Amino acid sequence: MVENIALLPEFAAQYPFLWGSFLFLSGLAFGSFFNVVIHRLPLMMEQAEGINLCFPASFCPQCREPIAWRDNIPLLGFLFLKGRSRCCGQPISPRYPLMELATGALFVLAGYLMAPGVPLLGGLILLSLLLILAAIDAQTQLLPDGLTLPLMWAGLLFNLSATYVPLAEAVVGAMAGYLSLWSVYWVFRLLSGKEALGYGDFKLLAALGAWLGWQALPQTLLLASPAA
C-alpha cells in the first residue's frame, strides 16, 4: 500500500490527464456527499428527529420521497432529470450540481498545485471543509462547531511534522486567529451595543491559523472581508 502511494507522483507526472480525470471524478463523488452534509447538518443542529448524515437514504427535499440511485449519480442525475425532481416535478436547486462541479474543479486545481502525498491530502481536506462551511454559512448564517473545530485540530495535526508551517506557528496562528476576532467582537459590542460577528467566525479563523500559521492571518482576513 505504501509503495503504491509512493508511485503516485510518478503516475501524475507521466499521465497528467488520467490524474486530473481521477481527481475530477473523485471531486464529483465527494461533492455529492458534501451536498448531504450541507442539507442535513443544519437539520441535525435543530435536533430534527430521525436524521443524520447516513440515515435515511437520500430523499427529495420537497416531498421527501426516496431518490433512486440512478437519479443520485453526481452531475449526471441532475442533467438526466433536466433539473427537476422525478417524484414531484419540483425544480432541483442548482446548488447540487454547482457544489459537485466546484469540488471537482478544486480537487483538480489542488492536484496540479501540490504533489500527491500528505500535503495534497491536507489541502483537499482544507478546501473541502471550507467549501462546505461557505455553503452552510450562505444558507443559514451558521458555522457549525462540528466542522470548524475538527478543521482546526486537523490543521494542527498536519503541522505536527511542519507540513505547511512549523507547529509553533500553527499553534500561535490558532490562538491569534481566535483572539483577534474575539477582541474585535467585544470592542464593537461595547461601543455600539450590536453584534457584528459570531463565535463561529472566531473558530474558523483559528482553524485557518492552525493550517497556515499566524503570518498568513492578515492576508486571510483581507481575502475574507469582501464575503463578510
From Swiss-Prot:
Keywords: Cell inner membrane, Cell membrane, Hydrolase, Membrane, Methyltransferase, Multifunctional enzyme, Protease, S-adenosyl-L-methionine, Transferase, Transmembrane, Transmembrane helix. It is a multi-pass membrane protein. It comes from the Bacteria. It holds the Pfam family Peptidase_A24. The chain crosses the membrane at residues 18-38, 95-115, 116-136, 147-167, 168-188, 204-224. GO terms for molecular function: aspartic-type endopeptidase activity; methyltransferase activity. The keyword S-adenosyl-L-methionine applies. InterPro entries: Peptidase_A24A_bac, Prepilin_IV_endopep_pep, Prepilin_pept_A24_N, Prepilin_peptidase/N-MTase. Plays an essential role in type IV pili and type II pseudopili formation by proteolytically removing the leader sequence from substrate proteins and subsequently monomethylating the alpha-amino group of the newly exposed N-terminal phenylalanine. Belongs to the peptidase A24 family. This is Prepilin leader peptidase/N-methyltransferase. It comes from Klebsiella pneumoniae. The lineage of its organism: Bacteria, Pseudomonadati, Pseudomonadota, Gammaproteobacteria, Enterobacterales. The gene is pulO.
